[in-house]
Amino acid sequence: MSDQEAKPSTEDLGDKKEGEYIKLKVIGQDSSEIHFKVKMTTHLKKLKESYCQRQGVPMNSLRFLFEGQRIADNHTPKELGMEEEDVIEVYQEQTGGHSNV
């Protein structure tokens, strides 16, 4: 397959609308999965807000990673090279680095 976006074949035309959206899996530390369908050009802040709302936690208490890199609010799936069924990992944000013992 090539990455060229020349004239779409008839096969591609049927999938064109579907191609604007991708399904992403968001997996929490407890291995729970939530699936999201997002536009390739949507800022991932919307996905992060939606996930946090479903989990009932503030957005700043979690960090979202794609392929080991932190996802910024203004990133889009297109910018990050995301594809169908890609996985976003969610971890508790850790603050501090020492104990007071």
From Swiss-Prot:
Q: Which UniProt keywords apply?
A: Acetylation, Cell membrane, Cytoplasm, Isopeptide bond, Membrane, Nucleus, Phosphoprotein, Ubl conjugation, Ubl conjugation pathway
Processing after translation: Cleavage of precursor form by SENP1 or SENP2 is necessary for function.
Give the UniProt record's GO annotations in the biological process aspect.
cellular response to cadmium ion; cellular response to heat; negative regulation of action potential; negative regulation of delayed rectifier potassium channel activity; protein sumoylation; roof of mouth development
Report the domain of life of the source organism: Eukaryota
Which CDD domains did the record assign? Ubl_SUMO1
Q: Give GO MF terms, alphabetically.
A: potassium channel regulator activity; transcription factor binding; ubiquitin protein ligase binding
Query: What SMART domains does the database record attribute to this sequence?
Result: UBQ
Can you locate the Glycyl lysine isopeptide (Lys-Gly) (interchain with G-Cter in SUMO1) cross-link?
7, 25
State which residues form the propeptide: 98-101
Q: Which residues carry this modification: N-acetylserine?
A: 2
Give the location in the cell: Nucleus membrane; Nucleus speckle; Cytoplasm; Nucleus, PML body
Site note Interaction with PIAS2 applies to: 36
Domain (Ubiquitin-like): give its ranges: 20-97
Gene Ontology CC annotations of this record:
cytoplasm; nuclear membrane; nuclear speck; nuclear stress granule; plasma membrane; PML body
Question: Taking the first listed entry, what is the main subcellular location of this protein, grouped into a coarse class?
Answer: nucleus
> Crosslink Glycyl lysine isopeptide (Gly-Lys) (interchain with K-? in acceptor proteins) sits at which residues?
97
> Which residues get modified to Phosphoserine?
2, 9, 32
Q: Which residues cross the membrane?
A: none
Assembly and binders: Covalently attached to KCNB1; UBE2I increases cross-linking with KCNB1 and PIAS1 decreases cross-links with KCNB1. Interacts with SAE2, RANBP2, PIAS1 and PIAS2. Interacts with PRKN. Covalently attached to a number of proteins such as IKFZ1, PML, RANGAP1, HIPK2, SP100, p53, p73-alpha, MDM2, JUN, DNMT3B and TDG. Also interacts with HIF1A, HIPK2, HIPK3, CHD3, EXOSC9, RAD51 and RAD52. Interacts with USP25 (via ts SIM domain); the interaction weakly sumoylates USP25. Interacts with SIMC1, CASP8AP2, RNF111 and SOBP (via SIM domains). Interacts with BHLHE40/DEC1. Interacts with RWDD3.
Report the sequence similarity comment from the record.
Belongs to the ubiquitin family. SUMO subfamily.
Q: What else is known?
A: Massive conjugation to proteins occurs in brain, kidney and liver during hibernation torpor.
- This chain's protein is named Small ubiquitin-related modifier 1
- Annotated source species: Ictidomys tridecemlineatus (Thirteen-lined ground squirrel)
